Regions:
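N-terminal accessory/precursor segments of enzymes
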Residues: 155-182, 216, 601-606, 630
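Long, internal stretches of domain cores in catalytic or enzyme-like folds
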Residues: 62-63, 74-80, 84-118, 128, ...
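An acidic-aromatic substrate-binding cleft motif
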Residues: 7-15, 221-224
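Basic/polar N-terminal segments that are highly enriched at the extreme N-terminus
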Residues: 1-3
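Extended polysaccharide-engagement surfaces of secreted carbohydrate-active enzymes
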Residues: 10, 14-23, 27-48, 52-54, ...
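Long, low-complexity, polar/charged, intrinsically disordered or flexibly structured peripheral segments
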Residues: 92-174
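Aromatic-lined, polymer-binding surfaces characteristic
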Residues: 174-428
Length: 1021
């Protein structure tokens, strides 16, 4: 008898609600129609039950997600042109009309050239499973292109090897995408059609397909195909998996589990039982004589397989993937005192992924526990981001939500992840990354080179908006859905319209999403925003954004291999475009030489390379200043870990408002230490023109040298292995080996992704640099060879060299449309008020003349305690300031962490007794909580108005571990001799004392007695 006795994912009352919704609401009716249409397409295309049953292949047909290993060879005909035009997965197929055939879209030729379908049928054994020993080798003949030779393009399942030694897995690729991946799509379509429509024919087909999968699933094992098979799967090079690599398997298995729950009540269906009984008579297959026998087969062959497969890493993905699969398996089987308890215990058990060389080709792999709570507490940061790139973090969030959703309402457990503070943070974690209502910063392995896309989960946001009291969730849900009439709850919700009411009430009260400047100090990302949301994401949108990334940059420091060594990377958005895009996702998401040495390396990003080597790993940098005044938005971040030889590696970036539609960015990048500094910057696709430089073209080679060639698509060169800094991926080199102290480079931006209707013909980015440099070069760097990407981008490389080098790269960067508003930029003199010597790198000031006659001074000082005379006319004491003159008179000023800013003659326009508050931490929230506090004691007397003025500022607590102590102050109250600072939903918890024994308590980000500062920012207009 089967164990399962009821539906648990889709209980009867939920199915009844769904069918009522289908009758009542147009959106639900459309969903049913779409599911039915898709299911009917599969039923017709595969010719009914028999075609679906035969779609399931067994272990002896390998699986590979690319045709050649890591897509190295591309196409047998057009080579890597295939990769550039169609990506890694661009082979075309028509399973209904031409099964087992792939079409190369670059030449329209088909592969394999033999009739593999006939060969496959000839090799079926008594169980209906393929055995190559039984197959007719006479069918392994090139039938399509005999002029190329009898064996050319022939694949027996193990691939075809060309004359150059490249192996092409046509059959394995087809089996991966058009058998097993297709099975997932079919089961989902049949499941949804049956649940929403009720027609038994969809359940009959689903039962037949699911039962056949259960026949073969226990024997499927990717690791049986050793490394020599040159198969490539989503397995992180572990070789583990079932129908496909272990990462994607953790998603694939869920469609099978949910299908079993959906079809469970009707598995006694006479048509399905009769069909499977007939198959059992033809083949040596047992257990098809009744609905309960079929249920038992599915439970034993699929559901109970999940726990051991997770334990041995055959099902293991990014965090949340396999945990969600295992939680679903436990809930579906519904055995609270047995398998369900074991499965959920593993999901929440502290544990890790363990590998060991045991002499076998792939080694031993084990997942000792799902580690859900330790991971949420220790790895997911206080901003709700996991340790991957943002797009992968979004996947993690969806998987964590699926765990929560599977357990929500299930009476076999008390676990409720929706109550966990980190889960609430995760569900809204995508929102602060949204830019111009159409972009997100492309950090790490994310997206393409400059493409639009929000990657918002509509269902997640709509549900979260109804679940939590956070207006931004509702605003983001409206943005994701676009058409407000389409906002609703899940189709299985008995009251799906309440979600629309929540969203509409929020929009009526708050308006559309219009994010202010923000600093995600836990994740490591600051976004400086100016302009307002017009409500229309088109070319009239005047919002502009500069961002600086400073989060996890490597799997070696708490991150993952989807991170890049890109600390203090700078990006720009404006005029509806991504104006300084990161390269995005490499052509292959693997550790290929080009990814390692170029796309994920430091020099391909808008940051600084020290000593011609990539950065070292870090968890997160240390923000020192963040401020937003309306006229000036500021971020200052130090990254002491990424270059240990540097005493300072720190970027200070400010966006300065010109008017309602235009801004410019002033950027100070201080590097103290090392012997060679390379400032790297690129804007979007477009011609780059230099002014003030005398550039000489280098006719051969790369930036690494005229005798160092650029590596091929998959080539790992001697330079890569011995140097590995990515300089050899720059070509089309032009150099000025004696550059002036000031020059500019102007990029004429191309609307690569056709975002704007007018093509953005007059949009540009101009960078003006004021530095004593040893060399300036303009070079080309390739974007990943993926459809839609630009072929290459033009980079500026500014170089300084010398012993114990100290550099503050000083730039003004202006996005513009039409004509720039910045007419000139010049470095101006700085003198100390006390007459002492001034370190010209420690304090810098630039004079920026604007096209309306106004003049701005931007000043940065490493020593805020000293007073300086700027350009013989401005007195300044502080860390950062912007001083604007109009007609020779003061017009506006912003001062951060300082006490004085104003004309040398006359009264200061900004003056205060202290630029910062300081003191020690007395206490803080010591548990995971939705609301958190830091209790402080100030040094000296601080008046109540000063304390109240801290709201909106940031506290920076010194830490001695890998997390920074930066928190936004959302409230401040005096209690006795202490001040309680409200830091909102950002937790003070860093991790468990011992993840194996959570009852021992937590470790914290702040510590009692730690020093802190609260820099103040003042504005005058």
């Amino acid at each position: 008898m089967p164990t399962k006795q009821r539906r648990t994912l889709y209980p009867d009352e939920a199915v009844e609600a769904a069918r009522r919704n289908v009758e009542q609401f147009e959106w639900a009716k459309r969903r049913r129609e779409e599911a039915v249409e898709e299911a009917d397409r599969y039923l017709e295309g595969y010719g009914g039950l028999d075609g679906l049953w035969r779609l399931v292949t067994s272990q002896e047909i390998p699986r590979s997600c690319t045709v050649s290993f890591k897509n190295e060879a591309g196409s047998p005909i057009t080579g890597t042109q295939f990769n550039e035009e169609h990506g890694s997965y661009g082979w075309e197929a028509d399973p209904f009309e031409a099964p087992w055939k792939l079409t190369d879209p670059t030449c329209e030729m088909q592969f394999p050239t033999n009739d593999f379908g006939a060969y496959y049928e000839s090799g079926l054994d008594e169980a209906g499973e393929f055995d190559p020993e039984l197959a007719d080798d006479d069918l392994l003949v090139n039938e399509l292109y005999p002029e190329r030779g009898e064996s050319w393009g022939v694949d027996d399942g193990t691939g075809w090897v060309d004359d150059e030694g490249n192996r092409y897995h046509f059959v394995a690729y087809y089996n991966h995408w058009h058998c097993w991946y297709e099975i997932r799509e079919i089961l989902q379509a049949l499941r949804d059609a049956f649940l929403l429509d009720g027609d038994r024919k969809y359940a009959q087909a689903g039962i037949v397909l699911l039962d056949r999968v259960a026949d073969v699933y226990p024997s499927l094992d990717l690791s049986a195909w050793g490394p020599e098979a040159e198969l490539y799967n989503s397995d992180a090079m572990s070789g583990q998996g079932r129908t496909m690599g272990c990462i994607w398997e953790s998603v694939q298995i869920r469609s099978k589990l949910s299908a079993y729950d959906a079809f469970f009540p009707v598995m006694d269906d006479e048509t399905a039982v009769a069909f499977l009984s007939d198959k059992a008579d033809v083949y040596e297959i047992e257990g098809k004589g009744s609905g309960d026998a079929i249920r038992k087969n599915v439970e034993e062959g699929i559901v109970r397989e999940v726990l051991p497969a997770v334990e041995c890493s055959q099902i293991r993905g990014n965090f949340g993937h396999h945990q969600a699969a295992l939680a679903m398996a436990g809930v579906v089987l519904d055995e609270p005192d047995g398998y369900t308890a074991d499965a959920l215990a593993h999901v929440f058990r502290p544990g890790e992924y363990v590998t060991e060389d045991d002499g076998t080709p792939w080694g031993r792999h084990e997942v000792t526990g799902g580690d859900v709570y330790p991971h949420l507490v220790e790895v997911v940061d206080r901003d709700g981001q996991a340790n991957e790139s943002p797009n992968y973090n979004a996947i993690v969030t969806r998987s964590v939500r699926e765990i929560a959703e599977v357990l929500d309402g299930y009476d076999g457990t008390d676990e409720d992840l929706y109550e966990h503070p980190k889960v609430e943070r995760m569900l809204g974690s995508r929102i602060p990354l949204l830019v111009l209502d159409r972009f997100t910063p492309h950090i790490g392995d994310s997206e393409e080179t400059g493409n639009p896309g929000l990657n918002l989960d509509e269902e997640l946001l709509v549900d979260a908006a109804a679940r939590y009291d956070d207006p931004q969730l509702a605003q983001a849900a409206a943005l994701a859905v676009e058409n407000l009439d389409e906002i609703h709850g899940d189709v299985f919700d008995p009251d799906p319209e309440r979600h629309a009411e929540v969203v509409q009430e929020t929009l009526d009260a708050e308006g559309p999403l219009d994010l202010p400047s923000g600093n995600l100090a836990g994740f490591g990302l600051a976004l400086l925003r100016q302009g307002e949301n017009s409500g229309e994401p088109d070319e009239t949108d005047d919002r502009r954004v500069a961002w600086v990334g400073y989060g996890r940059n490597s799997g070696e420091a708490g991150g993952s291999w989807h991170n890049h060594l890109d600390t203090l990377n700078l990006g720009l958005f404006g005029y509806g475009l991504n104006l300084a895009p990161d390269l995005g996702y490499p052509a292959l998401g693997s550790t290929t030489p080009k990814r390692r040495n170029w796309a994920a390396s430091t020099v391909s990003h808008n940051t600084v390379v020290v000593d011609a080597q990539p950065q070292k790993p870090q968890w997160v940098s240390e923000p020192k200043q963040f401020a937003s005044t309306g006229e000036v938005d500021l971020i200052d971040v130090a990254a002491p870990e990424v270059y240990p030889q540097a005493d300072e590696y720190r970027r200070t970036t400010a966006m300065v408002r010109f008017d309602d539609e235009r801004s410019y960015v002033v950027d100070f990048f201080r590097v103290a230490g090392g012997e060679e500094h390379h400032f790297s910057f690129h804007a979007g696709e477009g011609e780059a023109t230099a002014e003030g430089l005398d550039l000489l073209a280098q006719l051969e080679g790369t930036y690494a040298g005229p005798d160092v060639p650029r590596p091929g698509f998959r080539e790992d060169t001697e330079y890569n292995q011995e140097v590995g800094n990515g300089f050899n991926y720059f070509d089309a080199v032009e150099r000025d080996e004696a550059p002036p102290d000031s020059f500019s480079v102007d990029w004429d931006i191309v609307d690569t992704w056709d975002v704007r209707e007018d093509g953005a013909e007059d949009v540009g980015v101009r960078l003006t640099m004021c530095n004593d440099l040893d060399e300036v070069a303009l070079v080309d760097g390739e974007a990943p060879a993926k459809p839609g990407n630009p072929e290459r981008l033009r980079y500026l490389l500014a170089k300084r060299e010398g012993e114990d080098l100290d550099t503050t790269f000083t730039s003004v960067i202006e996005p513009y449309e039409g004509e720039p508003v910045v007419e000139s930029v010049e470095l101006v003199g700085v003198e100390a008020a006390d007459g002492e010597e001034v370190d010209s790198e420690a304090v810098r000031a630039v004079k920026i003349t604007l096209d309306d006659g106004r003049v701005d001074y931007a000043i940065r000082s490493s020593d805020p305690s000293r007073t300086y005379l700027i350009d013989d006319e401005i007195r300044f004491q502080g860390f950062f300031g912007v001083y604007r003159e109009e007609g020779g008179e003061p017009a506006a000023a912003v001062l951060s962490d300082g006490t004085e800013l104003g004309p040398e003659e006359g009264e200061p326009v900004l003056e205060t007794d202290r630029g910062r508050l300081a003191g020690t931490v007395a206490d803080f929230t010591r548990e995971l909580a939705h609301e958190n506090e830091i209790v402080v004691e100030f040094d000296g007397d601080v008046a109540e108005p000063e304390i109240e003025a801290c709201v909106g500022e940031w506290i920076y607590v010194e830490t001695d571990h890998d997390r920074n102590g930066a928190y936004e102050i959302q409230g401040a109250e005096i209690e006795g001799g202490q001040v309680v600072l409200d830091v909102g939903d950002r937790t003070t918890v860093r991790g468990y004392v011992d993840p194996e024994e959570p009852e021992q308590g937590f470790e914290y980000i702040p510590e009692e007695g730690a020093q802190f500062t609260i820099p103040r920012t003042y504005a005058w207009d």
